[in-house]
């Protein structure tokens, strides 16, 4: 599958509506193919994970050469302009695009998360943490019509990154430069958005407003909303809602709390708004989601 239509290149502007962007950016995408040289740099609001299986590849990330070694897992926040410049002998490469709100909801090393949101490129110390078989299976399962199978794949990818987090990693590009491309994300914007992401992650379950976020980073609210949407490619309100929905899904799956308690715990203040929002973002009612999750636990016991 090709996710380039969801991305911004250095010589084009993003014209998609925020609502259609959310539907694209909430999805996890996996490509498994031969790498190809990119004619220009591009950027997008997701976390990108690359694993070349049979040879090294070279990227230009924020105008710095980065060698991605065979068998190593490499990840970075893809709002930094990046371009694959040398495919070497590699014929088989996995490319994951992970929604930032999902990445930040997983129990990963806080230093790792901090490095990623501040523009560093991170590489696993160990090789062979992932096989082509797993990548192909996840790619197939993410397109399954069965919600339980799709969620199982997402859970397993989260565990893969948890293993990455625990098994040792190092930064291979520390983003000290301020070079930018025309129409791309400035270092100034990325810095402020990284602060906003941290604040939202800590406070999304409260009565959080856009003004609260803007005040935290000491920016005008309209300016804060503008740079957030430019970097993340969805609105701040959509992002906060996505964090809350992630929390709700976890509590529906893992606890027996009442649905109203769960909604309040995750930061929703109105029962009717919660039901409407959950249905819109997940495609089913909370009751249906809980039932599916319980069935999944019985089908795939931990």
UniProtKB/Swiss-Prot annotation:
Residues 194-292 form the HTH araC/xylS-type domain. One of its GO terms (biological process) is regulation of DNA-templated transcription. Residues 211-232, 259-282 bind DNA. Changing residue 271 to A: 50% reduced activity. Disulfide bonds: none annotated. Keywords: Activator, DNA-binding, Transcription, Transcription regulation. GO terms for molecular function: DNA binding; DNA-binding transcription factor activity; sequence-specific DNA binding. The keyword Ligase does not apply. InterPro entries: Homeodomain-like_sf (IPR009057), HTH_AraC (IPR018060), HTH_AraC-typ_CS (IPR018062), RmlC-like_jellyroll (IPR014710), RmlC_Cupin_sf (IPR011051), TF_DNA-bd_sf (IPR008917), Tscrpt_reg_AraC-type_HTH (IPR020449). It comes from the Bacteria. Pfam families: HTH_18. Transcription activator for the expression of the melAB operon. MelR binds at two sites located upstream of the melAB transcription site. This is Melibiose operon regulatory protein.
